[in-house]
Amino acid sequence: MEKFTQIEDKPLVPDEVSLFNGKFLDIINYKETEILQVKDKVAILPYFRDEATFLMRLEYLPAYQYKNMDKSNLKRITNYLTVITGAIEDGETPDKTIRRELYEESGLLLNNLYPFEVEGPYFVDKYNTSQIWVCLLELPVNSYRQIKPPTDGSKVEKLSKCIRVSVGDVNSIVNNDLISKYLITKLINRIGQ
């Protein structure tokens, strides 16, 4: 009997291999699966109960444009109606990000003590590490003040704007993404339309 067993010489394969590193996303191969790494996000639908309106973004979205470029009735559309969204920065909580994004994108400053509920986190999809927290934010009159939004200086924010929509028009909204549809449905259920 041999004192030493021969060990098969296999190259070590790391569990994670970086395929692409971008400004907003990375692609990695992990356990033989290509995975998108994107920052976690928040999605917010502010609802002004006393004014019977809610706030949405008419947002410049090149990804939607790219997907629709071969559709004759959609190829000229540059801005799409969505809820307010934003990335959670390092060290931020979802609550803090909601307050920051509301300020940056809409100019809404919430009172510091105003409480709100956040749902989540939910994974965006099966091949993405990003998780999203969602918030249907009911705002009574004295819970906020509104100023001109400072924006974050990005091209998307320069070409986008927030608009107030009457709750009477809630059933006319064309939803372009699942998160917006989810929050609009929550609003419809809340107001009983």
Please report, for each region that a protein language model flagged, where it lies by residue.
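Short Lys/Arg-enriched alpha/beta "domain-start" segment
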Residues: 1-11
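Local beta-strand/beta-hairpin segments that build beta-sheet-rich folds
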Residues: 7-8, 17-21, 116-119
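Acidic, metal-coordinating catalytic segment for phosphate/diphosphate chemistry
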Residues: 12-51, 61-69
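Unchanged
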Residues: 41-43, 75-178
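Short acidic, gly/pro-rich beta-turn/loop elements at beta-sheet edges
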Residues: 54, 66, 144-147
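Glycine-rich, pocket-lining loop/helix-strand segments that form or immediately flank
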Residues: 56-85
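Short, hydrophobic/amphipathic alpha-helical patches that form generic packing surfaces
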Residues: 181-192
